[in-house]
């Protein structure tokens, strides 16, 4: 339909946008072809020779050099000639379409007259000429371009002859005789110029035609056709006279029209007179130079004659083909810059203003200017006018419209109607910034806090406080000199130790203002430097690269070489000397005075404060110091020593980036301009990427000759050296080893075949080739999609690739028969017809004479073999891309690709280094991997993977591929036999892939996702997600060590899948309940009662009641209860995969490891009140089976419902690699990853809950839980004497109910039966929902109206405000009668429904059964009613608008209102509904069945308002009991005795040490020994439903348990600092029941989440809000009291003073462990705190100290001792030997002294204890002092140890756990870690040579070291803890072969190994630390 559009038909050669006549590209081509300048490529050179030959034959008598070539003149002669020769009647195309045209205009509200009413005059000539021209072009396109074939076409009397891509023009009169113009110019042009000529002709024809049509419709909107015609005639005349030169003049056409528009529109247009004058004089001068004065005068007259706005604007676009490149002549630019020489230039404001204008007009290419309508008065247009509509809507016309191309000229594509943005300040330049104006608070306030009070926007500030930006710039000098602005704070970026300008918000306002201005102004200049790509999009970059690299040559190849420059310390190197020149120029150009040139002063004179020392930085300290130094006349410090320095000569990261980039660019450009290669540069700060395009000759077979190789290589190195030299001039040094050149195909920005990284520009190319499974469902669609991707890739990488790529893909998919082989012509396919096979496939390749057109097809002797070789070779080349044919899931992202590539490359490398490949194949591969500048290296090295294997994500790429390929391809019903056969072949291909993977050394552990079904019982989760090899994994899964292929493993059915359950009970299988909605509804309907609590069916309300049991009788009682909670440890060990714990009935509690993921998700969800529960669920999800379990989906579903969002959209959940960013096990196994060991028995019961204060009763600060729990616990112990101090166990009252509910809600016991037929995942939710639905009428026994009303009430409450009409129809009750009949029943039904919907909502929010007691439920429900009051008022409001119903409710005691006036006001109504609903809820809950009448006196309105107010304040929350979600007893250590030595007491008696001549006592006491199990262990964590603690540290109980009996004080108060979860205080509370406790939590960056996995919960001081200042941190949304802040210490002291009388005893427990000497600030703070507390009370303090060496221990002890004489040391042996841990008790009454303990004395105390143990060991040589570990603990420890061995590739289970067996196992396992040449059948002789050279990796050696170390411990009882020494040692293998213990050097040595890898050294230390637990089993070794 687009009948004016040439491009649709002229398809082969679309014009590039630059193809206007004057595009430098085409002009240069013409000059090259006609031999005027040196041809750039071989192709043009050949063509040029042929053209010269033709010219010689033609113009025999002339010297060719004398001939003039000027296509512009030719055009100017040709167009008028063609137009005048054309007939005056309009040609056919218009007539054919006229009817359609008029219909179109009719739809716009115009009636178009018939054709004969129009007088087309001149337009007809243009139109007819354009049509004939188009016909000629289309014909010329279709003919084959054969060598030397000449074609001629005739238009009117002109002949066009096409020769060699050039067109000669003959005939006609006006000077076209014999192909000459006047003056000896040849009438000839290139084909591209001819196309451009047609474009011009076509555009003019359209313009005139549209003008004619519009003339009749909207005469005022368009200029007259004759005006346009005469303008065109003038233009032609000018071009004829001046040729190419006249184009410069025509370029000024748009500015000239602009000046006239300025005159017509006046001020509104905002053009300065200066500007108009400049343009006009400049144009006149140019016309004068070109001798076109008269012609130009006529033209300006034409412009001036048009005084109407709209027509004038239409003239704007007449010469748009000239406006494209906007290459202004130098004179023009100089003249315009001359504007700044006016006298006004002294005033900076004027000057800046002029600069703005000039840049605005000439540097922003206003090619879009004609798209913008200046504000036009649309009143003159008719209302139906298309133009008017487009303008008013501000949107573009419909491009699909048939006439769109006509519209393009006249109905300009308006983007939007704008005002010209020429304002009087620079502020249009600025990007606005938020800016804090005032920083006095920083300087004056000692505890500085961020000043959020006065945020102003920068521009607003300038507007209010300064006249203009110019004024600010003018003040730059004084700002620079101002001394008060000298202090700023910066942060140090820890990773790179660079200074980051992030803290520059602390600069004072003015310097910062300059900073922002400078950057913004510099940013504007980036228009002058298109290389700066900070803001460019990927598409822009790709376009730019593509445009630069276009090529049209045949066999000439191009190497795209990218160099990425990296500069040493870029910012620091930006000194004054190397940037000064550029900065001064910028200042001059922009007229900004000192803004840029003095930029370095700010850094040099400023005091830069280390802002990271404290946050926010304490500037007051520095200000005082600065003042002091200034007074002394000292300039400034030069060191960080005082946390400050000055005299910074370089720059600061993040400031002035733009201008420095410019400095760098200018240097780089200088070098590149000398190379004269096509290049483009991208720069961003110091990151400069240079893309060079180097032409090279490629041989016929596609290879590259060695000489070309060398040429490219030397070119590349010379550019490198040039760059280095040039940059050195400006003081910048290149990191040359990182300045890489790279070329070839890349994926994700990494080059696949050479170790160099590829650069920014290509990063996105690979993504094109990853195909999403949603887009391509079947093979054909897939292939179609693939080809488009290949196109995209070929834009970015060199051309050879796409051909290979396609072959690789086809070959790799197993569709082998689809591609037989590849030749330089392309791929040969088996289904091609013979004649096509032999033709050269690459079209457009020009052959030289005598070259064959066909290529002989050699018949292969063995085609199958050849095909296989090709496939093998191509699959090496495309190893990384082998996965492309399979659709991959979108979320696989880079990780899957990277891992897959790593696998493929590993296999390739293996094959290449095996030296087994035939030479032929190696040669093939070499030719494919032929990198022009690759260094001559071992081929295998090229296949080093650019990716590191990522172990932490869910599914391996290969398994995804297999899964998807199987499901998509097998399930398709493929009709095509041939294709089906291919798919079968592909299946076989997959199996091959499996075999390859099966043999590979390191299978990606993410295949675990599939293996996991089988290995559930066997594996420890840690092992699956970390370093297991394929072999180990299979060994574990299949119980036999031989290699099994992965495929058989994946297909093997799981023997016994284990489902992880939340909680369940033992019961007969027959009772299993199938979860189907129908079934649930039937149950509900059959058991429907009239009240909530029916006899037949228990409801959730009933299941909540409980009774308390005395713990002493629990053992007997639990036998009848048959409850077992299957409690899963977060890491099930290999054997005890079910860690069963005996405990109370309801413990849906999950141990988890929390990963950064949760913290991140938390931040993203902050502010969502439902966040907490969802996060708990998410962290649970981390630890359960990820794929096989239905539970996972349930959890995700719950989260999504809780948060109301799609979890996959959370960035943090998508970026899973970040989530598990634990870097292996460097520095010891990450403790949060480990299972349970002595150091963290409690890890798995702690939970990092992110809690925040929400305004509801269900989220309350966890601190309150603990304090409230402790208080209530104390209360219940004192009140219930019968329980003898123990807390009761809580069990359900109605066991049957619970049994039933349990079955219905969470039956997950039997996986095969656990399926919802309707796809319901969340059974509890389904239960609630179906329960609250209305039962079917037919299923109810009988229903009287009262019952129906009750049901409807219930339905109303559950239906969230939907219309109850349906329900009433259902129960045959008329809606009107509802209120009048039984309002009381309606209300009671409503309250019942409300209770249900509330319980349901709690289930959704909290994700597990909601079990509050009724007393707790009531206040929560009241609060809920208050919150949802509007909804209830809508549904029940009508009850209170009728007098009768209101009275009835009043009489029933449900309504508090005696109606005064009815209807009530809205507020009264809401209050009435609220109170009434609350009343009816309490009645329903309390009475269960009956309703008592209530007294008439209701609650007053004020009380309701007050109540609502209270409910909304935090204070109110504290009185509402928190619902008990879980009752918890987390005593993991039942029956585990603390170790105490049975020694004569004097061995450990106190000993006196001499210190500086004085005797000081240092006690070392052991813990008391008691034969009975500690009877009050129930205290570990209470069973009382009043306490909801998330796990108390059982270990701190061990440590503190014997201390209270040693203290002879009766404290009035206990203060706990850093007490974690409050476990440490429990023994003291047992000892003294009376004293209150204050918790305060120490906080430091390092201890947000402590290393052993428990959350440091910060109970503030007793109640919320007492501590001085709470700092909210991003990681933990809880208040933390930082004792290093003086205000907080004061608050603690105040809190203590308020609660005690003077000199009463206070006990302070300090649980801060692990403080090295770097923690001096903290230690000092605690010391200060202790001293200030001592002034007010008699202070006894207990401190936990755990240090790794005695020196630190002593230092800490001395600081804490506060000069006391003595300190008692309680030593806890339940610990590893490599730590010094003790409790230090410092009594209040001992005398003061100045002495300090020496390291020696403390060492002696520890020595004494150690000696004691040795003595004990000697006394009882037959048995070890540690009692036998209880079986459960033993299993846990064994699981830990065996999972460590598993990671080393060895299976250790229970039967191995005797020292002899373990020694045998390790001695024989060692040699098996090595690959021997042949199996060691005769074990006594093996030589060192028989060890394969590559068989021993660093990993293996690490394992050998671990084994040898263990052997030493097992044989000699020496468990060496000096890890640094161990890693240096050598391991030996002796005859047998067997492994020797460490330090044992055998006589016969088969082999010896030593660990080299640094990374492995760290890992090894971690492994050994973990294996140290073996000491628990074999403390004395073999003895």
From Swiss-Prot:
Q: Where in the cell is it found?
A: Virion; Host cytoplasm
The Mononegavirus-type SAM-dependent 2'-O-MTase domain covers which part of the protein? Answer: 1588-1785
The alphabetized UniProt keywords are:
ATP-binding, Host cytoplasm, Hydrolase, Methyltransferase, mRNA capping, mRNA processing, Multifunctional enzyme, Nucleotide-binding, Nucleotidyltransferase, RNA-directed RNA polymerase, S-adenosyl-L-methionine, Transferase, Viral RNA replication, Virion
Cellular component terms per the entry's GO annotation: host cell cytoplasm; virion component
One Pfam assignment? Mononeg_mRNAcap
Its catalytic activity?
RNA(n) + a ribonucleoside 5'-triphosphate = RNA(n+1) + diphosphate; a 5'-end (5'-triphosphoguanosine)-adenylyl-adenylyl-cytidylyl-adenosine in mRNA + 2 S-adenosyl-L-methionine = a 5'-end (N(7)-methyl 5'-triphosphoguanosine)-(2'-O-methyladenylyl)-adenylyl-cytidylyl-adenosine in mRNA + 2 S-adenosyl-L-homocysteine + H(+); a 5'-end (5'-triphosphoguanosine)-adenylyl-adenylyl-cytidylyl-adenosine in mRNA + S-adenosyl-L-methionine = a 5'-end (5'-triphosphoguanosine)-(2'-O-methyladenylyl)-adenylyl-cytidylyl-adenosine in mRNA + S-adenosyl-L-homocysteine + H(+); a 5'-end triphospho-adenylyl-adenylyl-cytidylyl-adenosine in mRNA + GDP + H(+) = a 5'-end (5'-triphosphoguanosine)-adenylyl-adenylyl-cytidylyl-adenosine in mRNA + diphosphate
Q: How does it assemble?
A: May form homodimer. Interacts with the P protein.
Q: What family is this protein classified in?
A: Belongs to the rhabdoviridae protein L family.
**Purpose:** RNA-directed RNA polymerase that catalyzes the transcription of viral mRNAs, their capping and polyadenylation. The template is composed of the viral RNA tightly encapsidated by the nucleoprotein (N). The viral polymerase binds to the genomic RNA at the 3' leader promoter, and transcribes subsequently all viral mRNAs with a decreasing efficiency. The first gene is the most transcribed, and the last the least transcribed. The viral phosphoprotein acts as a processivity factor. Capping is concomitant with initiation of mRNA transcription. RNA-directed RNA polymerase that catalyzes the replication of viral genomic RNA. The template is composed of the viral RNA tightly encapsidated by the nucleoprotein (N). The replicase mode is dependent on intracellular N protein concentration. In this mode, the polymerase replicates the whole viral genome without recognizing transcriptional signals, and the replicated genome is not caped or polyadenylated.
Q: Tell me the protein's name.
A: RNA-directed RNA polymerase L
What species is this protein from? Snakehead rhabdovirus (SHRV)
- Gene name? L
């Amino acid at each position: 339909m687009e009948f004016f559009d040439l491009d649709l038909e002229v398809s082969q050669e679309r014009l590039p946008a630059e193809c206007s006549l004057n595009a430098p590209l085409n002009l240069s081509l013409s000059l090259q072809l006609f031999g005027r300048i040196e041809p750039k490529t071989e192709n043009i050179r050949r063509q040029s020779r042929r053209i010269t030959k033709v010219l010689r034959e033609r113009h025999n008598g002339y010297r060719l050099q004398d001939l003039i070539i000027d296509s512009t003149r030719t055009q100017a002669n040709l167009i008028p000639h063609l137009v005048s020769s054309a007939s005056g009647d309009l040609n056919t195309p218009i007539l054919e379409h006229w009817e359609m045209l008029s219909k179109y205009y009719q739809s716009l509200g115009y009636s178009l007259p018939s054709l004969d009413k129009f007088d087309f005059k001149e337009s007809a000539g243009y139109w007819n000429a354009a049509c004939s021209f188009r016909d000629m072009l289309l014909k010329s396109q279709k003919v084959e371009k054969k060598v030397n074939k000449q074609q001629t076409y005739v238009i009117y009397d002109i002949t066009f002859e096409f020769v060699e891509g050039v067109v000669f023009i003959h005939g006609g009169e006006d000077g076209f005789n014999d192909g000459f113009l006047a003056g000896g110019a040849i009438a000839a042009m290139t084909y591209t110029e001819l196309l451009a000529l047609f474009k011009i002709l076509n555009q003019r024809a359209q313009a005139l035609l549209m003008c004619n049509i519009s003339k009749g419709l909207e005469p005022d909107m368009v200029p007259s056709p004759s005006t346009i015609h005469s303008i065109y005639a003038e233009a032609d005349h000018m071009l004829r006279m001046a040729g190419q030169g006249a184009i410069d003049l025509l370029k000024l056409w748009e500015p000239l029209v602009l000046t006239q528009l300025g005159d017509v529109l006046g001020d509104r247009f905002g053009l300065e007179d200066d500007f108009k004058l400049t343009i006009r004089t400049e144009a006149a001068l140019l016309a004068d130079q070109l001798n076109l004065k008269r012609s130009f005068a006529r033209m300006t007259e034409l412009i001036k004659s048009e005084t109407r706005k709209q027509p004038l604007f239409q003239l704007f676009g007449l010469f748009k083909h000239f406006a494209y490149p906007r290459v202004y002549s130098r004179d023009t630019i100089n003249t315009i810059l001359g504007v700044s020489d006016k006298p006004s230039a002294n005033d900076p404001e004027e000057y800046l203003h002029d600069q703005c204008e000039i840049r605005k007009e000439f540097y922003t290419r206003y090619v879009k200017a004609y798209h913008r309508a200046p504000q036009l008065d649309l009143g003159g247009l008719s209302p139906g006018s298309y133009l008017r509509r487009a303008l008013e809507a501000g949107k573009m016309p419909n491009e699909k419209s048939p006439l769109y191309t006509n519209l393009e000229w006249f109905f300009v594509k308006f983007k939007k109607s704008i005002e010209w943005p020429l304002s009087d300040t620079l502020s249009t330049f600025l990007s606005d910034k938020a800016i804090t104006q005032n920083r006095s608070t920083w300087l004056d306030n000692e505890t500085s806090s961020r000043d959020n009070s006065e945020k102003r926007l920068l521009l607003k500030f300038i507007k209010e406080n300064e006249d203009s930006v110019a004024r600010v710039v003018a003040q730059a000098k004084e700002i620079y000199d101002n001394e008060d602005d000298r202090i700023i704070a910066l942060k140090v970026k820890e990773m790179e130790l660079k200074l980051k300008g992030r803290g520059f918000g602390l600069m004072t306002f003015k310097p910062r203002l300059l900073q922002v201005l400078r950057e913004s102004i510099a940013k504007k200049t980036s228009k002058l430097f298109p290389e700066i790509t900070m803001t460019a999009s990927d598409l822009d970059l790709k376009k730019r690269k593509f445009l630069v690299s276009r090529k049209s040559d045949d066999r000439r190849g191009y190497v795209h070489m990218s160099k990425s420059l990296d500069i040493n310390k870029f910012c620091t190197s930006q000194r004054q000397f190397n940037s000064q020149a550029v900065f001064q120029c910028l200042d001059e150009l922009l007229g900004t005075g000192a803004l840029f040139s003095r930029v370095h002063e700010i850094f040099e004179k400023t005091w830069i404060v280390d802002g990271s020392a404290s946050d926010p930085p304490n500037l007051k300290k520095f200000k005082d110091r600065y003042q002091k130094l200034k007074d002394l006349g000292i300039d400034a410090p030069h060191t960080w020593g005082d946390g400050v320095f000055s005299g910074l000569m370089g720059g600061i990261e993040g400031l002035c980036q733009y201008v420095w980039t410019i400095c760098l660019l200018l240097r780089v450009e200088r070098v590149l301009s000398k190379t004269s290669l096509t290049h483009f540069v991208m720069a961003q700060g110091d990151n400069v990427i240079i893309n060079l395009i180097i032409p090279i000759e490629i041989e016929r077979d596609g290879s590259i000759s060695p000489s070309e190789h060398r040429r490219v290589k030397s070119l590349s190195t010379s550019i490198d050296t040039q760059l280095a030299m040039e940059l050195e001039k400006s003081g910048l040094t290149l990191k040359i080893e990182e300045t890489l050149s790279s070329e070839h195909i890349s994926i994700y920005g990494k080059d696949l075949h050479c170790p160099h990284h590829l650069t920014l520009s290509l990063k996105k190319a690979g993504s094109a080739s990853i195909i999403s499974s949603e887009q391509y469902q079947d093979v054909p669609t897939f292939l179609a999609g693939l080809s488009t991707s290949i196109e995209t890739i070929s834009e970015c990488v060199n051309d050879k690739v796409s051909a290979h790529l396609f072959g690789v893909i086809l070959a790799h998919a197993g569709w082998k028969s689809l591609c037989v082989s590849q030749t330089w012509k392309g791929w040969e396919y088996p289904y091609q017809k013979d004649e096509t096979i032999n033709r050269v496939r690459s079209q457009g390749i020009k052959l030289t004479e005598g070259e064959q057109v066909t290529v002989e097809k050699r018949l292969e002797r063995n085609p199958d073999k050849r095909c296989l070789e090709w496939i093998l070779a191509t699959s090496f080349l495309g190893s990384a891309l082998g996965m492309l044919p399979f659709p991959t899931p979108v979320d696989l992202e880079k990780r899957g690709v990277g891992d897959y590539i790593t696998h493929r490359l590993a296999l390739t490398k293996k094959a290449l280094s095996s030296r087994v490949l035939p030479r032929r194949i190696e040669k093939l591969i070499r030719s494919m991997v032929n990198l022009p500048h690759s260094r001559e290296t071992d081929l295998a090295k090229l296949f080093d993977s650019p990716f590191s294997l990522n172990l932490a994500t869910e599914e391996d790429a290969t398994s995804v591929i297999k899964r998807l390929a199987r499901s998509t391809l097998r399930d398709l019903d493929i009709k095509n036999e041939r294709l089906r056969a291919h798919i079968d072949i592909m299946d076989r291909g997959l199996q091959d892939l499996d075999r390859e993977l099966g043999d590979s050394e390191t299978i990606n552990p993410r295949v675990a996702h599939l293996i996991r079904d089988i290995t559930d019982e066997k594996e420890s989760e840690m092992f699956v997600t970390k370093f297991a090899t394929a072999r180990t994994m299979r060994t574990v899964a299949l119980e036999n060590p031989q290699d099994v292929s992965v495929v058989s493993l994946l297909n093997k059915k799981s023997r016994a899948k284990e489902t992880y359950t939340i909680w369940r009970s033992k019961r007969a299988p027959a009772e299993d309940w199938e979860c189907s909605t129908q079934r649930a509804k039937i149950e509900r309907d059959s058991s429907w009662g009239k009240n909530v609590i029916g006899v037949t069916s228990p409801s959730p309300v009933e299941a909540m009641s409980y009774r308390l049991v005395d713990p002493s009788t629990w053992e007997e009682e639990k036998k009848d209860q048959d409850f077992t909670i299957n409690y899963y440890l977060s890491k099930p060990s290999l054997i005890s995969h079910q860690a069963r714990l005996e405990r109370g009935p309801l413990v849906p509690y999950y141990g988890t490891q929390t990963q950064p993921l949760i913290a991140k998700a938390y931040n993203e969800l902050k502010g969502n009140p439902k966040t907490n529960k969802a996060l708990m669920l998410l962290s649970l999800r981390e630890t359960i089976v990820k794929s096989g379990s239905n539970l996972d989906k349930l959890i995700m579903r719950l989260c999504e419902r809780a948060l109301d969002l799609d979890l996959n959209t959370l960035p943090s959940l998508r970026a899973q690699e970040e989530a598990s960013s634990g870097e292996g096990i460097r520095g010891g196994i990450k403790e949060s990853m480990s299972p349970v060991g002595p150091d963290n028995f409690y890890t798995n019961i702690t939970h990092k809950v992110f809690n925040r204060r929400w305004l509801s009763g269900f989220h309350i600060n966890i601190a309150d839980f603990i304090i409230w729990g402790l208080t209530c616990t104390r209360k219940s112990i004192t009140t219930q004497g019968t329980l003898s101090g123990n807390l009761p166990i809580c069990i359900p009252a109605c066991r049957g109910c619970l049994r039933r509910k349990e079955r219905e809600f969470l039956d997950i016991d039997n996986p095969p039966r656990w399926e919802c037929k309707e796809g319901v995942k969340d059974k509890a939710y389904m239960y609630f929902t179906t329960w609250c639905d209305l039962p079917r009428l037919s299923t109810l026994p009988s229903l009287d109206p009262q019952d129906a009303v009750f049901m409807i009430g219930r339905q109303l409450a559950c239906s969230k405000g939907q219309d109850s009409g349906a329900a009433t129809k259902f129960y045959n009750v008329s809606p009107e009668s509802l209120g009048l009949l039984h309002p009381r029943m309606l209300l009671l039904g409503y309250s019942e429904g409300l209770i249900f919907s509330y319980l349901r909502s709690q289930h959704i929010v909290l994700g597990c059964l909601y079990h509050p007691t009724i007393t707790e439920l009531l206040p929560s429900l009241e609060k809920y009613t208050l919150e949802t009051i509007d909804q209830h008022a809508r549904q029940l409001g009508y009850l209170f608008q009728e007098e009768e119903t209101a009275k009835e409710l009043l009489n029933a005691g449900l309504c508090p209102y005696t109606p005064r006036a009815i209807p009530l006001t809205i507020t009264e109504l809401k209050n009435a509904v609220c109170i009434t609903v609350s009343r009816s809820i309490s009645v329903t809950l309390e009475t269960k069945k009956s309703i008592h009448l209530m007294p008439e006196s209701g609650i007053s309105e004020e009380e309701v308002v007050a109540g609502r107010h209270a409910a909304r304040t935090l204070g109110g929350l504290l009185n509402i009991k928190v619902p008990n979600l879980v009752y918890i007893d987390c005593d993991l250590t039942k029956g585990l005795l603390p170790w105490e030595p049975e020694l004569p007491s004097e061995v450990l008696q106190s000993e006196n040490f001499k210190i500086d001549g004085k005797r000081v006592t240092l006690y070392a006491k052991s813990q008391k020994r008691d034969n009975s199990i500690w009877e009050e262990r129930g205290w570990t964590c209470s069973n009382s439903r009043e306490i909801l603690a998330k796990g108390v540290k059982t270990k701190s109980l061990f440590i503190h348990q014997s201390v209270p009996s040693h203290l002879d004080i009766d404290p009035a108060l206990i203060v706990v600092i850093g007490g974690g979860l409050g476990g440490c205080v429990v023994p003291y509370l047992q000892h003294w029941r009376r004293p209150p406790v204050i918790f305060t939590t120490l906080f430091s960056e390092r201890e947000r989440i402590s290393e052993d996995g428990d959350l440091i919960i910060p109970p503030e001081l007793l109640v919320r809000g007492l501590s001085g200042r709470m700092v909210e941190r991003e990681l933990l949304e809880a208040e933390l009291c930082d004792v290093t802040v003086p205000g907080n210490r004061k608050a603690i002291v105040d809190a203590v003073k308020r609660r005690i009388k003077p000199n009463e005893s206070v006990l302070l427990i300090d649980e801060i462990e692990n403080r090295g000497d770097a923690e001096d600030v903290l230690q000092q703070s605690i010391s200060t705190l202790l001293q200030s507390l001592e002034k007010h009370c008699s202070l006894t303090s207990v401190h936990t100290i755990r240090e790794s060496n005695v020196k630190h221990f002593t230092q800490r002890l001395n600081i804490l001792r506060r000069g006391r004489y003595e300190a008692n040391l309680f030593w806890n042996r339940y610990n590893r030997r490599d730590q010094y841990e003790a409790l230090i008790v410092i009594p209040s009454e001992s005398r003061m002294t100045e002495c300090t303990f020496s390291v020696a004395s403390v060492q002696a105390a520890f020595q004494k204890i150690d000696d004691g143990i040795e003595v004990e060991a000697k006394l009882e040589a037959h048995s070890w002092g540690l009692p036998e570990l209880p079986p459960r603990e033993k299993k846990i420890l064994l699981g830990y140890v065996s999972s460590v061995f598993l990671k080393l590739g060895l299976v250790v289970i229970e039967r191995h756990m005797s020292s002899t067996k373990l020694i045998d196992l390790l001695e024989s396992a060692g040699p098996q870690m090595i690959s021997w040449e042949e199996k060691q059948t005769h074990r006594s002789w093996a030589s060192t040579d028989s060890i394969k050279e590559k068989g021993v990796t660093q990993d293996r050696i690490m394992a050998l070291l671990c084994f040898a170390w263990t052997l030493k411990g097992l044989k000699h009882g020496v468990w060496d803890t000096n890890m640094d020494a161990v890693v240096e040692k050598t391991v030996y293998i002796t005859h047998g072969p067997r492994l020797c213990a460490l330090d044992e050097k055998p006589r016969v040595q088969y082999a010896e190994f030593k660990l080299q890898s640094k990374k492995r050294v760290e890992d090894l230390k971690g492994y050994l630390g973990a294996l140290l637990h073996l000491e628990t089993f074999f403390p004395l070794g073999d003895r």
